[in-house]
Amino acid sequence: MLQYALVFFVIALIAAIFGFGGIAAGAVEIAKILFFIFLVVALVAAVMGLVRRGR
């Protein structure tokens, strides 16, 4: 589960680079939304991984 958190985090970083860096000027809003969605999913996956590891 922690691997999913890392994958989602990397995808969120890539979306942020494209969205906030001006490379994809037409898709800035979409990149911002995807960044926060993937960030939340990554955090949830990280917490779930830590909870499952504790059992």
Swiss-Prot record:
Any one annotated GO CC term: plasma membrane
Record membrane topology: Multi-pass membrane protein
Protein species of origin: Cupriavidus necator (strain ATCC 17699 / DSM 428 / KCTC 22496 / NCIMB 10442 / H16 / Stanier 337) (Ralstonia eutropha)
Keyword field: Cell membrane, Membrane, Transmembrane, Transmembrane helix
Keyword tRNA processing included in the entry's annotation: no
Membrane-traversing stretches: 5-25, 30-50
Localization annotation: Cell membrane
Record flagged with keyword Magnesium: no
Lineage: Bacteria, Pseudomonadati, Pseudomonadota, Betaproteobacteria, Burkholderiales
Name listed for the protein in its UniProt record: UPF0391 membrane protein H16_A0156
Domain of life: Bacteria
Family as reported in the entry's similarity comment: Belongs to the UPF0391 family.
